[in-house]
Amino acid sequence: TFVYNHHNREKLDTSLVISADETAKRIANGEHYVIRFKTPVNETLHLHDIIRGEVKFETNLLDDKVLFKSDGMPTYHLANIVDDHLMETSHVIRGEEWLPSMPLHVLLYRAFGWQAPEFAHLPLIMKPIGNGKLSKRDGDKLGFPVFPLDWKTPEGISSGYREKGFFPEAVINFLALLGWNDGTDKELFTLDELVAAFDLNRVHKAGAKFDPEKNKWFNHQYLIKQKDTTLAQAYAPILNEKGYSVADNVLIKVVSLIKERAHFVSEFWEMSDFFFVAPTTYDEKASKNWKPETPTLMQELISVVEGITDFTAMNIETIVKDWITKNEIGIGKIMQPFRLSLVGALKGPHLFDIVEVIGKDETINRIQKAIATL
């Protein structure tokens, strides 16, 4: 591979070889040219990186980078240095793939007579499986986002954190701990706590593997800290899309019962649909708990439920369990068919919370439907 450097710069057709007059003439004639940085020779650069400490570079191993392209536009290397200087940038914090560019950038600052900022080259975020840095393709293949927002290309859409339902604070918290910690086992930080605790000197040199499940765990932690009213407001549009609308207090109650099991608000419907619509099918495995004597027991349960006036979860549970104990009925013979009748499967939050939310009439209707169906 050809490398333009001190070994060949004076052996090529360049302004270092031809005269100034010839150079000016060829430029005036419209001949295309580039402007390169003339890297000094025989020098060892001892540079400081906040994360990696002292790093050394031999200038004889560096090439002469293009600063202005043939169309007159500056390259990134030049534009970056000028921008950072004009903006009075104090710290340049970037990925370690830019470490090889550090000597050129420092030499450019020196050539301009400007004070160079401090540099910190962060470790890369690595693939969750295998070796190499995380890429868009990894997210597409394994089903997790790598972009803040949905990214559309002719080949398709790569999902974004916002559209997936991640809280910004959760993503920041997760990313901050990839290659850094505060010296303790603490994992959950508010933004203010992160600002106070974060120190580049504690960033590791080695890359950290991206763990999609840990990412979801962080989002779960932030989700359960949200107020029920906030989550209910976020869930309401999803519910409306499904064709259902309920009173605010009911939705707040539902959210309070399911949020401990959710990672995202988008999961709420799958976890709570039975609060709003009666089951039309019954889980095949769970249906095996429906025995020949079950219909009779469920009819008796209906009579018990009909007689309850204080229809709160705690009171309903007390009365139903007292009836079970008094009649010496195995609790599994009632509770599993009861849940199957209301939910269609053996899942969901506390059974008597479900009963309270859907109400007496709906509870009885669902038991009757299960008796007729199963």
Predicted regions mapped to residue ranges:
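Active-site-proximal acidic segments at structured loop/helix or strand boundaries
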Residues: 182-237, 247, 252, 256
